[in-house]
Amino acid sequence: MDKNLLEAVKFDEKGLVCAIAQDAETKRVLMVAWMNAEALQKTVETGFAHYYSRSRQKQWMKGEESGHTQKVRELRLDCDGDTIVMLIAQNGGIACHTGRESCFYKKWNGGAWETADAVLKDEKEIYGSTH
């Protein structure tokens, strides 16, 4: 592990840090996930975003199943050291497992959440019928 990379990062009690993926060109927030030290190290080593799945309890590379990888252009750490922003190039234009550009596709509209972004590709086409 790279000591310089990790020493400023404040991982929580579970060994995780919040990671925000933001489109490097449009600046749109595409997704928020979690990283452990291994995922952060792999991200730096490979240049592609890696995360830690809390539900599956394992490290994974974004796009390993879908092909929608995230090429990291820049890493930034916030002033408290507890959140990482990755400026990325999103392969295929789809970051969300629902087949949308962003996981933030719901918009508050006068008392209800409404879907603001269209599905670009159906989940079954991306992952097959087993997902």
Curated annotation (Swiss-Prot):
Keywords: Amino-acid biosynthesis, Cytoplasm, Histidine biosynthesis, Hydrolase, Magnesium, Metal-binding, Zinc. InterPro entries: PRA-CH, PRib_AMP_CycHydrolase_dom, PRib_AMP_CycHydrolase_sf. The keyword Secreted does not apply. GO terms for cellular component: cytoplasm. Gene3D superfamilies: Phosphoribosyl-AMP cyclohydrolase (3.10.20.810). It holds the Pfam family PRA-CH. Pathway: Amino-acid biosynthesis; L-histidine biosynthesis; L-histidine from 5-phospho-alpha-D-ribose 1-diphosphate: step 3/9. GO terms for molecular function: magnesium ion binding; phosphoribosyl-AMP cyclohydrolase activity; zinc ion binding. Mg(2+) binds at D78, D80, D82. Catalyzes the hydrolysis of the adenine ring of phosphoribosyl-AMP. Belongs to the PRA-CH family. This is Phosphoribosyl-AMP cyclohydrolase. It comes from Neisseria gonorrhoeae (strain ATCC 700825 / FA 1090). The lineage of its organism: Bacteria, Pseudomonadati, Pseudomonadota, Betaproteobacteria, Neisseriales.
